[in-house]
């Protein structure tokens, strides 16, 4: 190398590149034939949630307490933001007695 910086011509590889055998000849342990039976499914984790929504009739504030999984609470959220409306007891009675 001449100078302070190395050039491509100055770099000399000392080790030769050799292919490596990726087949290491390891043996896998015997697996059960029915893998599905041996796998134990974990029960999904339930979390308590407090949901505050407005009544679909009079718009009074309603509180709803639920235990739900992550997927379950998302499904409930989609329903409540979509076409499902909750009713308070007063509006329920009004509808039951022929009102609205």
UniProtKB/Swiss-Prot annotation:
Localization (cell): Host cytoplasm; Host nucleus
Motif LXCXE motif positions after renumbering to this chain: 22-26
A GO BP annotation: symbiont-mediated suppression of host type I interferon-mediated signaling pathway
Organism in which the protein naturally occurs: Human papillomavirus 38
Keywords: Activator, DNA-binding, Early protein, G1/S host cell cycle checkpoint dysregulation by virus, Host cytoplasm, Host nucleus, Host-virus interaction, Inhibition of host innate immune response by virus, Inhibition of host interferon signaling pathway by virus, Interferon antiviral system evasion, Metal-binding, Modulation of host cell cycle by virus, Oncogene, Transcription, Transcription regulation, Viral immunoevasion, Zinc, Zinc-finger
Known partners and oligomeric status: Homodimer. Homooligomer. Interacts with host RB1; this interaction induces dissociation of RB1-E2F1 complex thereby disrupting RB1 activity. Interacts with host EP300; this interaction represses EP300 transcriptional activity. Interacts with protein E2; this interaction inhibits E7 oncogenic activity. Interacts with host TMEM173/STING; this interaction impairs the ability of TMEM173/STING to sense cytosolic DNA and promote the production of type I interferon (IFN-alpha and IFN-beta).
Lineage: Viruses, Monodnaviria, Shotokuvirae, Cossaviricota, Papovaviricetes
Post-translational modification: Highly phosphorylated.
Protein name: Protein E7
